Amino acid sequence: MDEIRILAPTGACGSGFLESSFEKGLSQAPHFIGCDAGSTDPGPAYLGTGKPAFPREAVKRDMRLMLKGARRLKVPLLIGSANTAGGDVHLAGLVSIVREIAAEEKLSFRMAVIHAEQSKAYLKKRLGEGRIKPLHPAPEFNEAVIDRSECTVGMMGAEPFMHALKEGAEVIIAGRASDTAIFAAMPVMNGFPEGLAWHAGKVLECGAAAVVNRKTGDCMFAWIRKDHFVLEAPDPELQCTPQSVASHSLYENADPFKLVECSGTLDLTNSTYEQISERAVKVSGSEFIPAERYTVKLEGAEKVGYQSVIIGSIRDPFFIRQIDDWTERLLVRCHARVKQVYGERMKPGDYHINIRIYGKNGTMGPLEPVKEITTHELCLIIEVTAPSQDEASSIAGIVRHQGLHLPIPEWSGLITALACPYNPAHLDRGPIFRFN
């Protein structure tokens, strides 16, 4: 085999792609179709709750097109990180969609289902053997962390996909997986240079993200050869350039030249990018450095508590000029009132109040380089986190009332400072999670 052709319909199953682009990609005779279906990008809630980031209907639409296309061409379909987080419940949800489509479309195929969720007993065993260590700058990892986790998954590399392909799988639905591994598996097992396979996979896993100006989620096509690979989006309106492809290595990476995978590191130091047509780019020189020890990244999510949120705006210029002092005084007043209401039943460490000020530094917090407030209004998002939803809601009610009437020296009499667009003013978010 001198060339392997790959079609990536979109960067996330459920985010959509153009049917016209997909049909054009199919007409170029791919050897397989691959699609990433998850990520840690949406946050820990999906791993913690077992829910997907995209609606079931959206995922089913994308899966139907991909399944029908793959079976029409009789080529494998590879899906990784099922239903966002890739735990067992996510995997089962996507498999059920696949089975529904197969029944509705009267499709028959050999399917491999690859699990990624890790049991607490297994993790504790490996921890005791010294086989687990925290990734910098993660905090200490111990049995307590394992016990607090709602779900823990291991991010698999290319090998499980390779094994399934060798066993004759025509459709592969995998739990949490390296996005890139989905696309690197078949080229590597067919003897193509690992550097080129992994680099092409890094671009393909985001669909059409490596074009100059992506208008919507869409397809990307790659031709991997022995000394280079070529990228071109099937949509004739989309253009790949050396800059658009090279700059994609900055996406989601601290180091744009060294990208770490389970089995080694993709090294782009000597990669070259060449415009070979108006819309296509040729890439060569990428290398893959095998790891001394194979590693699997663990991802876990634990429940922090329950949360209620208050959204309010402030437009008084006297108020805006002293917003930092006012929010500090508000927190003091709120904590004092919570103590009055709950006494020893609710200590300061049991709950948390956080205030984000949009129009000042709501996005970047203390990292915001612009210190002067020039806007005529501010938006405050006040988060209350507590052990239960009832407690979070109750404390949010306290915060709302304290914020409405907390005075500044320039005021005379009772004046309302905070304008809340919703009634009730607080929104209950339910359980919230963090990666651990």
PLM region descriptions:
Residues A12-G14, S39-D41, A82-A92, R176-I182, ...:
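Gly/Ser/Thr-rich loops at beta-strand to alpha-helix junctions
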Residues L7, P52, V75-G86, V171-I172, ...:
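Short glycine-rich or small-residue beta-strand-to-loop segments that form or flank ligand, phosphate
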Residues S119-A174:
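An acidic, phosphate/nucleotide-engaging active-site surface
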Residues D2-P9, G16, G34, P76, ...:
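Small-residue-enriched flexible segments
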Residues S108-R126, Y358-K360, A419-R429:
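Short, conserved secondary-structure transition motifs
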